[in-house]
Structure formats: structure tokens, C-alpha cells
Regions:
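Catalytic cores of secreted/periplasmic lytic hydrolases that degrade extracellular macromolecules
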Residues: 1-20, 24-155
Length: 155
């Protein structure tokens, strides 16, 4: 049903995956794309405002999508994983984990991101290594406390 599809596309992305992908794609936030365009996830564009990679071949016309603020980069990343056909299996497995009341973790789902980069399975291994070496699975279990506001300022 449409509601089932919508639920699959609105579910969470494990924090460990988001951190690992941002770290890998942006060189831990030090890449030219991150510094000049708030581009943490290396998303390509062919029509929107973007930054041209310096080492691309002449037949490659893509740019790296750039953003005014980091939050917009994260939002575009979430939208990409939650809607693009290349990640449908990622969403299906995540939905199955949710249905079975199992924990949704980065290490369980990284294998479904081989289409994110041209290096495929090697990319999955890189993400798994980043997650494991930096204990990022700890963040998959974290729950943020609600923000308390006083006069519109977070305390």
C-alpha cells in the first residue's frame, strides 16, 4: 500500500552509517567539497549548483552537490537513501528489522550501500571498518533527550 511505502521511506538511518559515510566522503570534514560547499556525502548533480571535481575526465559532467548549510546536506542525504531506487534493498531490510522488532544498526545495513560508490563492495568494507574502528555502533543505540527551551534558547 501507499502507506507502507511511505513508512519505508521515512524511517531512520543508523547514525553510525551517516557518520561513517560523511567521514569517508568528506575526509572527516576536511575535503574541498565539505569546506567550500558543506557537502558531507559526496552526492552528485548534473543540473544543480555544484562544485566540479578537479580530477574528473572530460566525459564526466557531474558536479558535487553543494549546500548553504550542513543541515541541508544531511537532509539531502536522508532523502537520497530513503527514496533513490539504488537503495531500495537497504529500505526493505530496514523495514524487515523494524517489523521484527530488531535493532537497526549500521553494521547490519552497510552491505546494502554498495551502489553508493563506484567501488561497490570495497566501499561497504571501508564503511564497516570506519564504524568498527571508531565504535560508531554506540551511536545507533543513543537516544537524545528532548531539548528544553528558555526564552527560545536551548539549554
Amino acid at each position: 500500500s501507499d502507506l507502507t511505502k511511505l513508512k519505508m521511506r521515512m524511517d531512520t538511518i543508523p547514525v553510525s552509517i551517516a557518520i561513517a559515510q560523511a567521514a569517508n566522503e568528506s575526509g572527516w570534514g576536511t575535503s574541498r567539497f565539505a569546506l567550500e560547499g558543506n557537502a558531507l556525502f559526496g552526492q552528485w548533480t548534473w543540473s544543480k549548483k555544484g562544485i566540479s571535481p578537479k580530477n574528473k575526465s572530460k566525459n564526466q559532467k557531474h558536479k558535487i552537490l553543494q549546500f548553504q548549510i550542513l543541515k541541508a546536506s544531511v537532509k539531502a542525504y536522508k532523502n537520497n537513501l530513503n527514496t533513490h531506487n539504488a537503495y531500495s534493498e537497504f529500505r526493505e531490510v530496514r523495514a524487515q528489522l523494524r517489523e521484527n522488532d530488531e535493532q537497526i544498526t549500521g553494521l547490519l545495513l552497510t552491505k546494502y550501500l554498495k551502489n553508493y560508490a563506484s567501488i561497490g563492495e570495497k566501499y561497504v568494507k571501508i564503511l564497516e571498518d570506519i564504524i568498527e574502528k571508531n565504535s560508531l555502533t554506540d551511536f545507533d543505540k543513543a537516544n537524545l533527550l528532548p531539548t528544553k527551551l528558555k526564552d527560545g534558547v536551548a539549554l
